[in-house]
């Protein structure tokens, strides 16, 4: 069979910190530095450029522990569970 006929599945790497915890910690770090956390996170998720995330409290290195799709999965999951 042609490889293009199969759906590719993303698999989480699994780690010691959940995507939810990472997003919360990064959000707080951005707020503490006076940034708009939503705008900064959207900029990072859209571009992949870590410069959108402050290095304050190791937020930049923390958010890079996960792939952007894992962060998006968490955001979508959380949004849909609240509906």
Curated annotation (Swiss-Prot):
Protein name per its UniProtKB record: UPF0297 protein DSY2420
Similarity comment: Belongs to the UPF0297 family.
Task: Enumerate the Pfam families for this protein.
Answer: IreB
InterPro entries attached here?
Answer: IreB
Identify the domain of life: Bacteria
Disulfide bonds, which pairs? none
